């Protein structure tokens, strides 16, 4: 088994954001409470640097991590959108962080890790990578939605989001399994090649797989009838986190839907 080659140029935006989040956690250990405001500036610097790398690459297409991620103009557009949402979240969360005595290091790092998950979802050229991106987005959001630990509504929001998110992930994995059983691969280009033959659509596994995949992503979008969790989670989460979830998660799921169905899952 060969280890896939890593295109460092294509992976640079993901690596910069990851290193920024890890750097925030590291500096948070040593900075005094009075100087922790610099953690937000560090996060914004990492976001702006990542945006600069993305803008400089427009017009170029790269495949990263064994062709499981694709970095093209489509994904770069959504990456810039996610990073803009993260930057605005940092700016509007200053008062929330101070008033609610939120741990700044963990807060800013989790926002960046969630943004990284969004970027992976928009760039996924493989259904397994799509699932990993979705989980990288969801797990930080489970924690962020319950960040106000002293409030019962925040605890309730985190628990509901965690349980329903686990169900949605299970549906998504079942859908991926059905599509793999039909096409013999989880790569979108190979699934597209398989489905290009009309006879492939006679296999019921294809429709089960697509249906379950839609259910999993529809939960993240909050599409009817999978929207019942939204009011409780949005009410219990910190205001800045609610804004981040409203804008970011829907854009990420929409990008994943466009990528999957525009590339492979259409007749």
Q: What residue spans do the PLM features occupy?
A:
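Alpha-helical transmembrane segments of multi-pass membrane proteins predominantly involved
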Residues: 1-267
């Amino acid at each position: 088994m060969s280890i896939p080659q890593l295109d460092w140029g294509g992976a640079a935006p993901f690596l910069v954001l990851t290193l920024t989040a890890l750097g925030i956690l590291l500096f948070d250990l040593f900075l005094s409470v009075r100087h922790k405001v610099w953690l937000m500036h560090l996060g914004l610097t990492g976001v702006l640097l990542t945006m600069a790398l993305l803008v400089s690459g427009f017009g170029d297409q790269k495949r990263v991590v064994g062709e499981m991620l694709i970095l093209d103009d489509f994904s770069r557009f959504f990456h810039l959108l996610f990073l803009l949402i993260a930057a605005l979240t940092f700016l509007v969360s200053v008062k929330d962080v101070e008033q609610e005595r939120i741990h700044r290091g963990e807060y800013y790092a989790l926002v960046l890790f969630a943004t990284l998950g969004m970027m992976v979802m928009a760039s996924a050229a493989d259904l397994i990578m799509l699932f990993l991106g979705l989980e990288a987005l969801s797990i930080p959001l489970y924690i962020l939605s319950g960040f106000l630990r002293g409030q019962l509504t925040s605890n309730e929001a985190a628990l509901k989001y965690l349980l329903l998110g686990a169900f949605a992930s299970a549906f998504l994995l079942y859908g991926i399994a059905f599509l793999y059983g039909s096409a013999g691969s989880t790569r979108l280009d190979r699934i597209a090649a398989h489905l290009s033959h009309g006879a492939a659509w006679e296999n019921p596994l294809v429709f089960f797989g697509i249906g379950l995949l839609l259910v999993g992503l529809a939960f993240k979008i909050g599409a009817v009838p999978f929207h019942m969790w939204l009011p409780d989670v949005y009410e219990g989460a910190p205001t800045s986190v609610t804004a981040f979830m409203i804008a970011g998660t829907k854009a990420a799921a929409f990008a994943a839907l466009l990528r999957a169905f525009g590339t492979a899952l259409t007749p």
